[in-house]
Amino acid sequence: MGDEDVDGKCKNMSACSSTTSYSTKLFLFMVPLVVISGFVFVNIGPKDSTSLLTSLSTTTSHLPPPFLSTAPAPAPSPLLPEILPSLPASSLSTKVESIQGDYNRTIQLNMINVTATSNNVSSTASLEPKKRRVLSNLEKIEFKLQKARASIKAASMDDPVDDPDYVPLGPMYWNAKVFHRSYLEMEKQFKIYVYKEGEPPLFHDGPCKSIYSMEGSFIYEIETDTRFRTNNPDKAHVFYLPFSVVKMVRYVYERNSRDFSPIRNTVKDYINLVGDKYPYWNRSIGADHFILSCHDWGPEASFSHPHLGHNSIRALCNANTSERFKPRKDVSIPEINLRTGSLTGLVGGPSPSSRPILAFFAGGVHGPVRPVLLQHWENKDNDIRVHKYLPRGTSYSDMMRNSKFCICPSGYEVASPRIVEALYSGCVPVLINSGYVPPFSDVLNWRSFSVIVSVEDIPNLKTILTSISPRQYLRMYRRVLKVRRHFEVNSPAKRFDVFHMILHSIWVRRLNVKIREV
């Protein structure tokens, strides 16, 4: 009504400009109406606009993040639904949706500005278009990550993508199409900055021919890599702290001293060094930084600095939830014993029909699980071959190749190189442990190609294994042959091998975090 009065006033004033007294009266009559109409516009207009903006944001917030499952537990829709099973819905959804919400708010605010100025022609002519704010490097990174999330989320509804090397298919994957899309997005944009500070042997070095070979293998591959490594930290998604706990135990720790402080101080000093020299650690409080360790003391070393243990991505062989391993942010990596530094002679084995032994294990009495296994099965059954020491002249690798199932109990720590050795040999792994998160569980459905047995069920081991039908065993065997490519060490690295699977797990953890400017 106020707008109609204003238009009427303009017409009357142009028609009767010669009558001064009448114009004066009309002016005095119209001023209050103009004031009232302006008051109404100011109070109603913004309130309606805000309501529209709030409605849009609310709608956006209902979209589930790409890596959070909405399916019931018995039928997960993983990569990334089952990927972080312990992640609270609120923490992940807030981080992911805030990105989409910020982007939608920018669009909506621009629409409101255009609508408001179009209602007033005279003021529109005097307004200059607003300059777009230049995004920072971090904001550009986060915007591209948001697009990657959307692409990955949509993958489950799309057709499989052709790939010249390998197309993930089958029940070995929680969601093969989502994993493949995520892997391709990683190849497209993932960048890692390796801090150059530090000298060998404690930094930029690691063992390549031992049970801890993943430390040295990863350091070598990432430092010689040209696809994922960047020399520009402003373009990096994550930052690698390239120290080796194995080397610290060898060169810093005083044997039998039980004094962990030299290792703790080395880690703490290194983080303080890069934190003082660069802005990136303090910007995220370590959330976009990662370490990799296969030593039993890796988890303990990570808590040398509180933010490293609590915030950073920790790629660990010793992935034990009872020792503060957190699947929502940490990465379980395989323990691989490369005695010669290569896979020569390690991969391969006969067909199922040429495997006469039902199950096999040989190993020392380490930790709480193995004594129970040996107590019930050592030298007591021809089908379940359990030995503390192998008989003279018997080959360990030949026993694995001649067995249908390979028993992989935890020792002092939950991880065991036997798991990968079983996969290499074409032997279905039997995992017996407590609190262990198997490698790449964010992507791989271990129950489809391995047998998981609780410590309490060790006495029933033969019953459990013989209850698996020949047809089901054959399916598991074939899946082992397919999935073992993800555990193979290659130099140079090959797509979908263990190096790239570790990178993918780190990539997924980075996708689940949003870093903001400080």
From Swiss-Prot:
Its main location: Golgi. The keyword Transmembrane helix applies. InterPro entries: Exostosin, Exostosin_GT47. It is found in: Golgi apparatus membrane. Pfam families: Exostosin_GT47 (PF03016). It is an enzyme of class 2 (transferase). Residues 1-25 are cytoplasmic. Its EC number is 2.4.-.-. Gene3D superfamilies: Glycogen Phosphorylase B. GO terms for molecular function: glycosyltransferase activity. SUPFAM superfamilies: UDP-Glycosyltransferase/glycogen phosphorylase (SSF53756). Residues 47-518 are lumenal. It is a single-pass type II membrane protein. The chain crosses the membrane at residues 26-46. The keyword Protein biosynthesis does not apply. Glycans are attached at N104, N113, N120, N282, N320. Disulfide bonds: none annotated. GO terms for biological process: cell wall organization; protein glycosylation. GO terms for cellular component: Golgi membrane. Keywords: Cell wall biogenesis/degradation, Glycoprotein, Glycosyltransferase, Golgi apparatus, Membrane, Signal-anchor, Transferase, Transmembrane, Transmembrane helix. Belongs to the glycosyltransferase 47 family. May be involved in cell wall biosynthesis. This is Probable glycosyltransferase At5g03795. The lineage of its organism: Eukaryota, Viridiplantae, Streptophyta, Embryophyta, Tracheophyta.
